[in-house]
Amino acid sequence: MKRMNILLVMLLWVASQMQAQLVQENETAIVYYMPKTELVITLSYDCVEQIPGVFYQYAQRYLGAKNIVTEKKTTYRLNDMTLCTKASADTDRAYKVNAQKGYNTQLLSLTTDGRLAGYNIGYEVKGDKVKGEKQEAKAEKQEELMPLLEEQFMAGSVAKMAEGAAKQIYRIRETRLNILGGDVEHVPADGKAMQLVLDELDQQEQALVALFVGTTMVTHHKHTFSYLPADDVEKEVVCRLSKYTGIVDKNDLSGEPIYLTLKAHKQSLQTAYMVDPKATIPSQLYYNLPGTADISLQHQALSISQSITVAQYGVSIPLALDLFKSKQEYSIYMHPETGNILSIKQ
């Protein structure tokens, strides 16, 4: 037990010394960083815009309609929430490899932001895709002319125009029934031609009915933002959804809260000792033994839960110096997202 405690202290001291070191003037060294994990939260929501028809006051009288839009309004509703992760360099966990101490620094492979990707692997540097903070689908609306005939426009009053539009709707429905029943003078030549005629009649009817019951247009939107996991949190408000303005700031009480709960499972130096109890002579190359976290998001009745790997919850463990002093060449593959070892090959 005493030996184990001494080794744990040594590991902690070595890690702290490596992080404290800076590249001195005229010193040949490469600095690399452990990764840190960010949550990328995407909220999918709809904007529902309702516009009343010009004849909405006559919808019940002429069409017997009940679900009628009587006023113009816009509302928002949340459909889905998703979680994923992205990695970046953790500048608080920096290490260096000194060329004067027998390391071939040219064999080090780093990502564009300085995370360690491997040693002697010929890593191809690829830039991470940058995601926008907010992405929204846009819908363009065009003014449409009312689908009325000349005689309806000349009716002289809104009530007469509504009556004429209703009669036109019933004529369209009657024509459709006659075509389907074969009770027309000129029957469409084939099934495809008949379907084209029926589709045209449907469009005419929908346009006329909308003058009475109104229209509802739904546009789909996405809001994406990042969250950096730290300590445990219980129902932290990360943002809000307002029924009338959409996604708003977490301090805007006009919206209903979207909660995030996080339970961290951090690694310890005791775990590091269990990984390598022989405590071989450490090198200047460290890998990360990451931790995990249980994440949940909740908004009213909608909720999701997920377990993720979190790099900053891990501990740094030195690779054995023997790997670099051996006559055999080793290739060490690292996971740039977590800092952990993927594989070691001769």
Predicted regions and their residues:
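Bacterial Sec-dependent N-terminal signal peptides
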Residues: M1-L22
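N-terminal amphipathic/basic membrane-interacting segments and domains
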Residues: Q21-Q346
